[in-house]
């Protein structure tokens, strides 16, 4: 997944979806930023960025920002689409013990009363269906050494909706799981960011009381093949 990436230095992120980077030869390149969040601490000018190349000729921007290597020495996966890809691989390999033992793994299944799609629906004979909602976590707050991660990094009405849907599934007798995919190498634990989204934090507590299970998954962010 993180193979054949190229390195540059971040100049700036702007318009949410764009970033300017400086290549090793001094040239400036505009790349696609696949992250709609605030990206606090993930997009500081001067940080190293690692980007992938697409062969899709229809794309306006050929290059995609995948990873940040911070001045503090942490790896961050800023491409939020990678969270589900990493979790999918982990589920198929039974790497997440709490979610192992299911024979069927389906992605993007419609469910709930608010027109949602669950990231993963796990099923097996003699087991309740398990609804798994994945959220990528990259917000590491001060003091950094404590490793406290928070979600979300900004107000998320979509995230609030997903918590309501998980509560509903649990009330119907299914298993409901909120899985934080920790995509920041400095984060050691995750909690709801009530200082950024009060409503989400309230729903998070309601969900836990209703029996929604909360887990963290820490995928390996080492890079097997890097090209400078």
From Swiss-Prot:
Protein name, UniProt field: Sugar fermentation stimulation protein homolog
User: Which residue windows are coiled coil?
Assistant: none
Q: Name one GO molecular function term.
A: DNA binding
What Pfam families does UniProt report for this protein, alphabetically? SfsA, SfsA_N
The family this protein is said to belong to: Belongs to the SfsA family.
